[in-house]
Amino acid sequence: MTQLFVKQVIEGCTAGLPAQIKYYTQFNQPVKIIDDTLSEVIGAVINNTLCGGSGGGGWDACDGGEQKNSSHVQSKFCADCGKKVSFFAEHCPHCGCSGFKAKSKQKGTKVTNPRDGRWGISAKSHFQYKEELKEYRLSLVEPLSDDHNCREFRFTYWTLDKNSEHLDLYAQAQLNSKKSNHINFQPYGVDFYLSRPVMKFTGVLTVHEDRTEFDFDFFDLDNNTPLEIPAEFACKDSKSVVESKKFGKERGEWVRN
């Protein structure tokens, strides 16, 4: 599938964002820059397949691909009244305060975006349907700044091998846990890098007053080289990382497709 067509799909399907940001924010409704449905469409486009049309059952794509989408364009908390407020709000719609914080119990207003959106992967399904599964397809939306005026958002798409040794180890430990069946998979965390994701494309979506524009920074659908593990995780190994986890103590927001 051509790079130009992917660009056209993203821009065409996000064309309503200028109005959504304006009116959704007025009524304190969160705005999904690229929602789960669109992420599945994008996955189908670049893999030359069709969406599964499962509505919660079966694979997200007809070729056996499973799409996981997450976003760091997240709501914040009013520093005065404590209520949750849309990312794009300049003032709290409840009390008019202009100070915000990322967490309700946070001290100070320096950090306003939790950036803790995650992907949810079922440990049970990972093993139960592994033969039919082709791969995991991960996508993430990130604001280039945490300011309410931000109109530029990075969108990145990776694939994750279903036979990843680290993912298998993590999933088995999670499955054996009595507390939860779900892997709370954090973008850019140690589990992410040790699972050896492969970037297929990344770019920036700009929301103009009357349209959107997507520009690629990288696009290679044939890329099979896993991301380089950052220096901070270079000394980590899967066994010790998984053994150090306190299973069942879920943090952050995760998207279940």
Model-found features: residue ranges?
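Nucleic-acid endonuclease domains
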Residues: M1-W59, D63, Q67-N257
